[in-house]
Swiss-Prot record:
Pfam families: Ribosomal_L16. Keywords: Ribonucleoprotein, Ribosomal protein. NCBIfam families: PRK04199.1-1, PRK04199.1-4. Belongs to the universal ribosomal protein uL16 family. It comes from Sulfolobus acidocaldarius (strain ATCC 33909 / DSM 639 / JCM 8929 / NBRC 15157 / NCIMB 11770). One of its GO terms (molecular function) is structural constituent of ribosome. The keyword NAD does not apply. One of its GO terms (cellular component) is ribonucleoprotein complex. The keyword Ribonucleoprotein applies. It comes from the Archaea. This is Large ribosomal subunit protein uL16. InterPro entries: Ribosomal_uL16, Ribosomal_uL16_arc, Ribosomal_uL16_CS_euk_arc, Ribosomal_uL16_dom, Ribosomal_uL16_euk_arch, Ribosomal_uL16_sf. GO terms for biological process: translation. The lineage of its organism: Archaea, Thermoproteota, Thermoprotei, Sulfolobales, Sulfolobaceae.
Amino acid sequence: MPLRPGRCYRKFSGPAYTRREYIPGIPMPKITKFVMGNVNGDYDYELRLITTEKGQIRHNALEAARVIALKYLSKKLASEQNFALVVTKYPHHVIRENKMMAFAGADRLQDGMRLSFGKPIGTAARLEKLGELVMYVRVKKEHLEAAKEALKIASSKLPIRTKIEISALNKEAAAQ
């Protein structure tokens, strides 16, 4: 069966389902790299992608946002030494799906809501508070606009609304 749309898993209710030792067959998260670029560099600004609503972000949406932000920054800034990109959320929550068939004669093959717990199909990061940090980018002053655009493009890959917050890292940048 194909992957359901992200809107199916955006909202959550109940406790997180995270105990991997009790859950057989959890697929690995698509996102594997969380820190990219030169994290030890000397930067002027930090741009943060912050949530404005509660919700869940599936692992493939986190990976899509990371990939597009990294691709844009690498292209615009010519080198991965000119920025640091860090994804701060990890998809711990296991998502289940009770597969339903929608074709003629499917009622003979499936059980409906009997035994409807579902099988694990992926993982998601839960954002339970407003203003949680999803990812951040650190850049020098001359690359500020490119970093803003990269986070704007990355936010379009996420299922919940976000905003970009800019803060100066050193006193000279704060004075300007």
